[in-house]
């Protein structure tokens, strides 16, 4: 069995914000608005909320509990869980734990590139060069130039490794800053989009269910998959965070709060993107 963790997050809200920070990502900002727009609008939203509610009582608490009971990472948690069936099953569980771990590593590699591009865009926005540039030409120029974003990539990788090296308290402090900033930025954008002409059609699309769409099994499948991915269920992140959750905390309560703020992030992102698409007549 792997060495157990003996340090926890400093506060309840620190754990929740860190968990939300782990869950919120492309699945919320890009995936949810995209699937909402292409799968029936309000009908997809209702089904998605149903699955989020279910997973906040079943899947997410189970992963927090697995991590907390084992007090270690994904491999140790899977080994511990399978060993409860029989001693010989522990090794098999540890091997199975490599699947979500490998998946998380692949996602991290992709995110490192995406965050590098975002950092590049931030720097160019602050410098003013992006404000007047043709965005397609701007992206094409630096993405086709060898090593043009290497300095930004180094900053992203070093910053990530430093945060991880400093432990759970460092992740907690980072998310206490970054997650409120994330919500503030998207709320400001949502207000700005609400003032655009024609944006009201986007709100009607989002919140008026097409009841006939509920009969389409593919919409149910897409909504369930989106809820899985958005909450990071069946990954390794929530199991690892569970290892740093205090024994006094209620895992179901923590999972519900995590799911709530994760869903708010997804809906706010959709409130920015979908009405803007209707306003600018984008497909």
Which residue stretches match the model-derived regions?
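Membrane-embedded translocation segments of transport machinery
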Residues: 2-9, 172-283
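Inter-helical loop and helix-membrane interface segments of multi-pass membrane transporters/permeases
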Residues: 3-6, 35-39, 69-102, 112-168, ...
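Transmembrane helix-boundary motif of multi-pass solute transporters/channels
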Residues: 11-51, 201, 236-245, 253-256, ...
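Central hydrophobic cores of alpha-helical transmembrane segments in multi-pass inner-membrane proteins
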Residues: 27, 47, 52-64, 68, ...
């Amino acid at each position: 069995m792997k060495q157990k963790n003996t340090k926890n997050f400093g506060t309840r809200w620190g754990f929740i914000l860190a968990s939300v920070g782990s869950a919120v990502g492309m699945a919320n900002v890009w995936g949810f608005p995209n699937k909402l727009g292409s799968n029936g609008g309000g009908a997809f939203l209702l089904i998605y909320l149903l699955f989020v509610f279910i997973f906040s009582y079943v899947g997410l608490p189970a992963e927090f509990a697995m991590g907390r009971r084992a007090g270690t990472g994904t491999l140790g948690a899977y080994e511990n869980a399978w060993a409860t069936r029989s001693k010989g099953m522990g090794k098999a569980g540890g091997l199975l734990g490599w699947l979500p771990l490998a998946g998380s590593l692949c996602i991290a590699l992709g995110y490192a590139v995406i965050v590098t591009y975002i950092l590049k865009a931030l720097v160019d926005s602050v410098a003013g060069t992006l404000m007047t540039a043709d965005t397609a030409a701007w992206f094409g120029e630096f993405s086709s130039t060898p090593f043009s974003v290497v300095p930004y990539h180094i900053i992203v990788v070093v910053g990530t490794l430093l945060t991880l090296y400093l432990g759970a308290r460092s992740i907690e402090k980072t998310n206490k800053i970054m997650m409120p900033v994330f919500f503030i930025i998207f709320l400001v954008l949502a207000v700005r989009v609400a003032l655009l002409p024609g944006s009201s059609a986007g709100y009607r699309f989002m919140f008026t269910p097409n009841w006939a769409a509920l009969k389409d099994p593919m919409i149910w499948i897409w909504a369930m998959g989106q809820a899985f991915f958005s909450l990071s269920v069946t990954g390794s992140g929530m199991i690892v965070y569970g290892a740093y959750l205090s024994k006094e905390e209620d895992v179901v309560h923590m999972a519900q709060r995590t799911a709530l703020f994760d869903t708010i992030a997804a809906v706010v992102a959709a409130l920015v993107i979908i009405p803007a698409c209707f306003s600018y007549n984008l497909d």
